[in-house]
From Swiss-Prot:
Tetrapolymerization of the monopyrrole PBG into the hydroxymethylbilane pre-uroporphyrinogen in several discrete steps. GO terms for molecular function: hydroxymethylbilane synthase activity. It catalyses: 4 porphobilinogen + H2O = hydroxymethylbilane + 4 NH4(+). Pfam families: Porphobil_deam (PF01379), Porphobil_deamC (PF03900). The keyword Transferase applies. SUPFAM superfamilies: Periplasmic binding protein-like II, Porphobilinogen deaminase (hydroxymethylbilane synthase), C-terminal domain. The lineage of its organism: Archaea, Thermoproteota, Thermoprotei, Thermoproteales, Thermoproteaceae. GO terms for biological process: protoporphyrinogen IX biosynthetic process. It comes from Caldivirga maquilingensis (strain ATCC 700844 / DSM 13496 / JCM 10307 / IC-167). PANTHER family: PORPHOBILINOGEN DEAMINASE. Its cofactor is dipyrromethane. This is Probable porphobilinogen deaminase.
Length: 305
């Protein structure tokens, strides 16, 4: 079987695709691959923060279109970039084992959020990271930053920023581990799906789905299902400052979730254990708790997203 894989062309996307291919080959020996490189709107328009472009699934949509058009068999994504709602003709079919779900502060001197110098300039284009950081450090200036990982690190080294906030998983996949300080999910709840690579295929490809499901990590797949159900119930897209992390432990999800306004003035964060027998229901339970405690804030954020 030859599997045509649609992916973005960045170093991180290609590394994630390699992880997927290696995982598939562990469980299916008679498989070959062909890469279909897709350039997305998010790759082309680097002039604005993602939340100002105003397109849902800015990194996901065009890659999935290659599958819908029959040009590729599957699409590979950072699951955190994939909206809760995708085409009805597509489905999430595989997740390799999850990598580190946390956010990380990257600096030249291994600062933590607490030890960042007063009035530091911190780079991120994520409203979620911006809001939770400002809720902890009102003195810092958050400056948007775009581009691939190497570009961002170069801007840090050039002195344009004192620190960056990035996904720990992406740094680890590219073997960037110097001067990295992880941020606790209780302080900055990660984006739903962060640290997970998602593989999407057409619903009607039973032959392909069988191969891919055999290669999937079930624990990670359940965590993905819970977090995406959480995101779906809130009704939020990738540009709402919302975090949700469900980690399986002995039949329960340790679920940490939160929401914050972009200026860090108002936030809600909670951690709880929820029965994991039905991952989608667990995600909805977490979402209902967040809505009970922060309904007004969520409504305002959704209105302007």
């Amino acid at each position: 079987m030859i599997i045509r894989i649609a992916t973005r062309g960045s170093a991180l996307s290609l590394k994630q695709t390699k992880i997927v291919m290696d995982r598939i080959l562990e469980f299916n020996k008679d498989v070959e691959f062909k890469l279909i490189i897709v350039k997305t709107t998010g790759d082309v328009d680097l002039s604005k923060p993602l939340y100002e472009i105003g397109v849902k699934g800015i990194f996901e949509r065009e890659v999935n279109q290659a599958v819908l058009r029959g040009e590729a068999d599957v699409a590979v994504h950072s699951l955190k970039d994939m909206p809760a709602q995708i085409s009805n003709d597509l489905t999430l079919v595989m997740t390799p084992p999850r990598d580190n779900p946390r956010d990380a502060l990257v600096s030249l001197r291994q600062y933590t959020v607490d030890t960042l110098p007063l009035n530091s300039i911190v780079g991120t284009s994520s409203l979620r990271r911006r809001g939770f950081l400002l809720s902890l450090r009102r003195d810092v200036t958050v400056k948007p930053i775009r581009g691939n990982v190497d570009t961002r690190i170069r801007k840090l080294n050039n002195g344009e920023y004192d620190a960056l906030i990035m996904a720990a998983a992406g740094l680890e996949r590219l073997s960037i581990n110097a001067n990295v300080s992880e941020i606790s999910p209780e302080l900055m709840p990660p984006a739903p799906g962060q640290g997970i690579i998602g593989v999407v295929a057409r619903r009607d490809r039973d032959d392909l789905i069988k191969v891919l499901r055999r290669s999937s990590d079930e624990e990670t797949f359940k965590e993905a299902a819970a977090e995406r159900a959480f995101l779906s119930r809130i009704g939020a897209g990738c540009h709402v400052p919302l975090g949700g992390l469900a980690l399986l432990d002995d039949g329960y999800f340790d679920f940490t979730y939160g929401v914050v306004d972009p200026d860090g003035v108002e936030k809600f964060i909670n951690s709880t254990r929820i029965d994991a027998r039905n991952p989608e229901e667990a995600g909805r339970v977490a979402a209902e708790d967040l809505l009970r405690n922060a309904r007004g804030l969520v409504a305002r954020l959704l209105k302007y997203s």
